[in-house]
Amino acid sequence: MRVLIVKTSSMGDVLHTLPALTDAQQAIPGIKFDWVVEEGFAQIPSWHAAVERVIPVAIRRWRKAWFSAPIKAERKAFREALQAENYDAVIDAQGLVKSAALVTRLAHGVKHGMDWQTAREPLASLFYNRKHHIAKQQHAVERTRELFAKSLGYSKPQTQGDYAIAQHFLTNLPTDAGEYAVFLHATTRDDKHWPEEHWRELIGLLADSGIRIKLPWGAPHEEERAKRLAEGFAYVEVLPKMSLEGVARVLAGAKFVVSVDTGLSHLTAALDRPNITVYGPTDPGLIGGYGKNQMVCRAPGNELSQLTANAVK
């Protein structure tokens, strides 16, 4: 059986889809998946053993120059790659009109998705041949597991979902695995940042622990923040620029992780590493860290400036 997954973004949403593949793999021996995903997250599906082909899409980039000759050529190549296979099922786990119209609609196969009442954008359900009612008041991982089970005809396991990607990194862990912590200090929204003085206070509290601290970053302003956090602490290392797979490998070897609400926090959960995630204005209830040893630290009054380092430690 060959199935196409449409789950293009974001990082957390893509990661939250992985346990559903593990369920399907256990229920249907030999099942294989192709996966349409935004180019920036294209490494993630390849870490799961059930994924045979990753089809990158670049809707975010294309829409900036949709009708330019280079973008039209890329869109044509994507459509040809998408339509090269006739699928036993196409599962749209995104639930958005944009991805349903630009991706799911074009694929060959019976199209499954959430119904009008439960899709993230109800209009997206108009593009599906089979519409499934998936209750909203459950974690995003469980919603996707239920969607896959109903689409492919098996009972959703009652056990906790298994991302099944940690083993991808076990054969090539960093040489100092288990001897360091990773602090994920960067996120996209200003109100989700934990103040730098609190990060530095937490770093200071670990001075006598014997644990080194590694600080990854993605954008130049994040590198500057990492350098400010590390200043004066010999046991703190600002990492070089890394690919997503490189960051994942560092996370896989961490003794523990402390993070703000960010996609890499979900990656930490997917890698089964102990993680404390600090939350301010966002509610972790239905979209927070899912997995083993995932701890939530809520800020008083949902204001991260009020969350002290001692409360996190």
Positions of the model-derived regions?
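Catalytic machinery of carbohydrate-active enzymes
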Residues: 1-313
